[in-house]
């Protein structure tokens, strides 16, 4: 299994992975609309020269207070082809891509997802760090991971995703 940054020639396969994983086109459309925006990151899992997984990060904003300006990214989507799920591919994508986020100066990552799954990587309820989601979601499914200890100390407010998220919902 190889994890690497996406390449131009991967775009059709990435689209297919997202459609297969989510059984709809919304996530694939979202990725296409966000691709190329500053501070987006996209990685693929490749096995035998086939893309079997994909993870994408895009910038979010904090409408509130923070002692300093921070780069915060939103993890969405994470997709693995159904026949490759439950083999650790999503785990590998998350672990390696979070390292890349840190290398690029990102201080925290937010995600909307399963607490049972994402807590394995250190994600906690964003509410514990004074953050809430702009969408009406349960507190426990909106999570955050500080990539630098204490990065969110003194921060509070509403995390806002890019407009493309609403357009593709």
Question: What residue ranges belong to the model's regions?
Answer:
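A conserved beta-turn-beta hairpin within the catalytic core of GNAT-like acetyltransferases
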Residues: 60-75, 85, 104
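Conserved glycine-rich acetyl-CoA-binding loop
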Residues: 50, 81-92, 104, 120-121
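Conserved acetyl-CoA-binding loop-helix of GNAT-fold acetyltransferases
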Residues: 75, 80, 86-99, 110-111
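Short amphipathic alpha-helix that is part of the acyltransferase structural core
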Residues: 1-30, 37-52, 70-72, 149-150, ...
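Short, solvent-exposed loop/turn elements at beta->coil junctions and helix N-caps
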Residues: 30-35, 129-133
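Conserved active-site alpha-helix within GNAT-family acetyltransferase domains
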Residues: 103-107, 112-138
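Short hydrophobic/aromatic beta-strand or adjacent loop that forms the aromatic wall/cage
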Residues: 40, 138-143
């Amino acid at each position: 299994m190889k994890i690497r940054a996406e390449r131009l020639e991967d775009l059709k396969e990435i689209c297919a992975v997202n459609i297969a994983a989510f059984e709809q086109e919304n996530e694939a459309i979202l990725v296409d609309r966000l691709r190329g925006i500053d501070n987006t990151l996209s990685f693929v899992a490749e096995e035998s020269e086939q893309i079997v997984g994909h993870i994408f990060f895009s910038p979010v904003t904090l409408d509130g207070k923070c002692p300093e300006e921070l780069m915060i990214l939103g993890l969405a989507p994470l997709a693995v082809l159904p026949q490759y799920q439950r083999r650790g591919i999503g785990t590998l994508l998350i672990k390696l891509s979070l390292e890349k986020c840190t290398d690029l100066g990102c201080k925290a990552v937010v995600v909307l997802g399963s607490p049972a799954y994402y807590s394995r990587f250190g994600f906690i309820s964003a509410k514990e760090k004074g953050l809430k989601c702009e969408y009406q979601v349960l507190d426990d499914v909106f999570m955050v991971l500080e990539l630098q200890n204490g990065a969110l100390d003194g921060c509070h407010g509403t995390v806002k995703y890019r407009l493309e998220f609403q357009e593709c919902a």
